[in-house]
Amino acid sequence: MNFPKYVMTNTNDLDMAIREAKNPMCEWYDANHDDLPYFENIVTGEQFGNYHHTSWSCGHCPGRWAESLFFSQLVTGMELDPVVFQKLKKWVFKVYSNHINLPANIDLNTFELKKEVDLCNLRESFFGLTAVYLYDHDIRVFTIAEKVIATVEKYFDFENGRWDSTAYEEATGAKSVGLFTGDLEQTRFCNTFGRFIGGLVRYYEISHSAAALTLACKLSDVALRSVVLEDGTFDPDRTAAHPYSTTSMLSGIALLADITGDMLLFNRLKSFMENGFYQIAIDTGWVTENLNRTNLVGEINNSCDLLEVCLFLGKAGFSKYYERAEQMLRGHILPSQLLDTCFISDKNYIDDSKNHMARRVKGAFGFPTPYGHEDEPGSVISYNWDIIGGVSGLCWSKCHQTTENNDIYSINLLFDYENHDIKFSSPYQHDDILSIKLRAKKNLRIRLSSRIDLKKLKEELKKSGIIYCILGDWLYLNHLMVGHTYSFCFPFIEEDKEYIFKNHHLTFRWKGDSIIAASSEGKRLCFFQELS
């Protein structure tokens, strides 16, 4: 193994990123314990290997993996291995076989289910139930989901936003724990029922369940009254210091806003992205793993939750949020994917939890810094298997990359794109040259980065003889001939921008919505060339 200054990255190819990210989810199952997925992964140091968790191995990873694998097949056409999916389906159902009406934790000594639920897992278990139904239409999903919803309605106090764990335990014999941030945090709204909103919305989309939609709306009301306030701030006294508690809730509220068109929800999300976001993150898309940290270890789950918020805000008409989404993709999420495993052992171990680690971990997302895989030389590097939010974020990006409304094609995210109507070649991938070819008569608009030289762009378009109109953040090209390829320079502006997070000073060189260099003196495994 070696630890070079720079690692190989991908900042342009969404399909490749999704394809590589599927790899670990097809690999890490414990054959000695009924194919239970692993949760914890450590690729450097003395704790090298994969490990189980009493809650997240059984209640979290199966649902998250099932949803991500099915979603990736849906948006890319990449076939889902049915053997792998059946392993996940087994656990999606198994955690509900303990007669407590909520997803159970597992005893790591006996590997039997416990009379115990980690309320954090409600969202991921519903992701799994939804994916199982979409994949093979198993109607057991509806019976389980409706029982969960009824249980939450019975024991959750919507006035004060608290779970009545005592009454629930008296009725079922099951303890409610808050392993997400420690037992004392079990009544935190964000990391339990707040994050459940997204799972309910995904389930509603397959079931049209009135109970699911009602519960999602009631929980969102609690969120708006107690956590997602008008001022948009991130207050750890309300949310807990672990941002994933909050970001996972925000992505769920964005899903609800999308299906309802509720502008109150969109405006609260927008307020957070303009205020609270900068308490936990920077424009590149990096988000701290925990606000109590003094180092720069982040978490891709957090980044991709907020990416999804940006995508749905963009869809709602706030076009600047498509720019923020592309900056997050190109500036952090894509380059942070583990594609270069030169620093990870690929030894053959008898213990399958360590065997051929480098090959089987490739494609994972984890806890990156703004500049690389490693915080400081010698820091432990981990890719825990709940960080599959990276796949979900990429899949949602594919969905929003190009959209069509009222016979107008919108290029929202400037990645290469091709279908039966259009072929688009991105200037980021082709030396600043944008090319477009219509295969059917369409009106077209392309989102403009705020870092583009409009004067030069107009000169380029005039030189090319292209009829155009610029309105706000959009370049309209409504008179293109079918079958003709139009190519012109898309003149991005380069800008060095400094960010201060706590006591850390970070400088990045932007070109359009991508990063081409960064400050990283003394660091290893870096994503970007060091600023000169």
Residue ranges with predicted function:
Residues 1-532:
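Glycan-recognition and catalytic cores of secretory/periplasmic carbohydrate-active enzymes
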